Design a protein with these regions (language model features):
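Non-catalytic cap/lid and distal C-terminal segments of serine-dependent acyl enzymes
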Residues: 1-134
């Protein structure tokens, strides 16, 4: 992602190649990896979303060991999950850590399970907030 995909995209497509114009989001296992990579590389990503993040998601203190830095760098941190999703606890523990450390984020719990109906809605809502100047 960092060494191959981003350089390829920046070389072959007309994109603005800086962190303020780069987002990362995913669902389920991809949601966990989006949080892991996005929050672990705040010099590369400013907009991060995890939808129904899976057990591969790092523990919150590992995800964000320096909350003060994150407060300055994150433009949007989106955490969402269905209220009947068996993985809800992963999103909740991440949300709780962000609240405890006063890291700005959006937590969205909605009716639903671990399925595409929930994720389509999450992506739609998340996308409305991307690259918006505050």
């Amino acid at each position: 992602l960092l060494k191959d995909l981003i350089p390829f995209i920046e070389k072959n497509y007309p994109v603005i190649g800086n962190r303020e114009n780069r987002a990362l989001a995913g669902l389920s296992m991809g949601g966990g990896q989006s949080l892991n990579f996005g929050l672990g590389n705040l010099d590369t990503f400013a907009w991060v979303g995890g939808f129904s993040s899976a057990p591969n998601t790092k523990m919150p203190a590992q995800l964000l060991p320096n909350p003060a830095e994150a407060k300055d760098k994150i433009k949007l941190l989106w955490i969402s999950c269905g209220d009947e999703d068996r993985l809800l606890g992963i999103s909740e523990r991440t949300r709780d850590y962000m609240i405890e450390h006063k890291v700005p984020h959006i937590y969205f719990k909605e009716p639903g399970k671990h399925d595409f109906q929930v994720w389509k809605n999450d992506l739609y809502l998340f996308a409305q907030l991307l690259f918006v100047k505050k």
